[in-house]
A protein has these predicted regions:
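N-terminal export/targeting leaders of redox proteins
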Residues: 1-38, 96, 116, 124, ...
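Sequence/structural segment immediately N-terminal to covalent heme-attachment motifs in c-type
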Residues: 34-54, 71-79, 139
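Short pre-active-site segment immediately N-terminal to redox-active cysteine/selenocysteine motifs
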Residues: 44-50, 55, 85, 97, ...
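Extracytoplasmic electron-transfer domains, predominantly the class I c-type cytochrome c fold
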Residues: 50, 57-111, 190-191
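Acidic, Gly/Ser/Thr-rich repeat motifs that build Ca2+-stabilized beta-propeller blades
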Residues: 98-100, 105-277, 326-329, 335-342, ...
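Blade/loop signatures of beta-propeller domains
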Residues: 113-134, 236, 299-309, 365-380
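Beta-propeller blade signature
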Residues: 224-233, 284-296, 352
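Conserved blade-ending motifs and adjacent loop-strand segments that build the rim/top face
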Residues: 434-454
Length: 475
């Protein structure tokens, strides 16, 4: 009797093992079947394209793209990577759906990855709704250019997020400028914006935003910082760190940080929430999730809104922000405008007023990346509404108001870059309301910065492929 039971048990175990192997093999095949790939494509566009690009271009440099199989991609999708802001999707997708999504991503990258990097047709005339122009490539071969500023002699300062500062002069790039501080150059961190003091001709100050690395810590931690320095030859000197955000964290995203001067001796910039939205943006005892205002020497203005609030950081000008990526002053009203990234949907365009609460994360028009509800509130007493919000997200970045007479049909329009959707966006504004939007240069690359040059032309910095473009109007 015992032998019969034992034999039966062995047979049952063998049958189960065969069934498990069949199911396992079948599940592996499912990921590549047309129906499942179609579902994976839909899931990618719905959940992933906003950050990684609709054509999968952000995956081209991932190390796991060259690995056999999909185990690394599967793990990243299922469990996420908190330090870089990659959410976990284990509650959103089943394992077969994750496997299909991982297979879709790997299958979608062409062998020639340069095909993922769109180029502008040289000399081709771009016809927008009200303005014709030609796109001229001024500088190429850059590594994720971020900031862009012009010296009085016409030389161009370019920051690369990897931590290099370059000078473009007479058609050539300099070696990296010496004298920069230690940086947390990982993820979204590194060397960020560059801005010349309005009286640069007299004082020579150049301002830099960057993710400062704590060199005393055993693990890499840091936060947004602002340094000013002077330039001589190919080196910086008189370096002064005038701001360093607190607390420091090991997360390498949501640093902000564009710089703007108001013409009255004040510098404005945004410090992102550092990926901890429930901890920082609504509290005044930390720097994160805030717009800051300083005097140009780093001291705190006497009329800052929270300077007399017990426990508050004195440089805070407004709070309740997620990740401000664009900062500029309106050329007529003098108002401070910012663009900031929402989560999935809910990117915002805001006019910043002192002491106001802009709501994040209590109110938002977006949801979590994995599709779950972030908040049920889109408005609340005591919290500001955006001038405009984008659904779906465009990932708005550096921006500027068009000035001068070279682009008469765009005058005082707002131009801002889109990172994930890879276009330049023109926004028509009247009485602080958005009347119209136009997408320009679709597929040009991740538009990181938009700058009005001293020559009156519009310049764009493109992350991938790394280059600086100039828009030449055609009459």
């Amino acid at each position: 009797m015992k032998k019969i039971i034992l034999i039966s048990g062995i047979l049952l175990l063998a049958i189960n093992l065969v069934m498990i192997l069949m199911i396992s093999c079948h599940s592996g095949d499912l990921s590549g079947q047309p129906g499942n790939q179609s579902i994976a494509a839909d899931n990618y566009l719905k959940y992933c394209a906003g950050c990684h690009g609709s054509k999968l271009e952000k995956f081209a440099e991932k190390a796991w793209m060259d690995e056999e199989g999909t185990s690394s991609a599967f793990s990243s999708i299922k469990f996420g990577i908190e330090t870089i802001g990659m959410p976990a999707f284990q509650k959103t997708f089943s394992d077969p759906e994750i496997e299909a999504l991982a297979a879709y991503v790997k299958k979608g990258i062409p062998e020639d990855r340069s095909l993922l990097k769109p180029a502008v047709t040289p000399g081709g005339v771009v016809e927008s709704e009200v303005q014709k122009f030609v796109v001229d490539t001024v500088v190429s071969g850059l590594n994720v250019p971020w900031g862009l500023a012009f010296l009085p002699n016409g030389d161009m300062l370019i920051s690369e997020r990897s931590g290099s500062l370059l000078i473009f002069s007479k058609g050539k790039l300099s070696p990296p400028v010496e004298g920069l501080p230690p940086m947390m150059a990982v993820g979204q961190g590194g060397l960020l914006d560059i801005c010349l003091h309005p009286d640069y001709d007299k004082n020579g100050w150049i301002y830099f935003s960057y993710s400062a690395l704590n060199t005393q810590s055993k693990k890499p931690i840091g936060n947004t910082a602002i340094m000013r320095a002077r330039l001589k030859g190919n080196a910086l000197y008189d370096q002064q760190v005038i701001y360093k955000g607190t607390p420091e964290t090991d997360r390498n995203y949501h640093f902000g940080c564009k710089i703007a001067f108001d013409g009255e001796g004040h510098i404005f910039f945004g410090n992102g929430d550092r990926g901890q939205h429930f901890d920082f943006p609504q509290k005044l005892d930390n720097s994160n999730g805030k717009i800051h205002r300083l005097n140009d020497d780093g001291t705190i203005p006497a009329d800052n809104p929270f300077i007399r609030t017990p426990g508050a950081i004195g440089s805070i000008y407004s709070y309740g922000h997620r990740n401000p990526q664009g900062t500029c002053i309106h050329p007529v009203t003098g108002d401070l405008w910012i663009s900031e990234h929402g989560p999935r949907g809910g990117d915002e365009l805001n006019i910043i007023k002192p002491g106001l609460n802009y709501g994040w994360p209590v109110i938002s028009y977006g949801i979590n990346y994995d599709g779950t509800i972030l908040t049920n509130e889109i408005e609340k007493e005591g919290m500001e509404q955006p001038v405009f919000y984008w659904i779906p997200s465009i990932g708005p970045c550096g921006m500027t108001f068009v000035t001068g007479d070279r682009y008469k049909n765009w005058k005082y329009n707002l131009l801002l870059g889109s990172l994930p959707l890879k276009h330049l966006e023109r926004v028509v504004i009247k009485n602080n309301s958005v009347l119209h939007r136009e997408e320009l240069l679709g597929g040009i690359g991740r538009v990181r910065n938009v700058v009005m040059g001293p020559d009156g032309y519009i310049y764009l910095s493109i992350e991938t492929p790394g280059k600086i473009l100039k828009l030449m109007p055609v009459l």
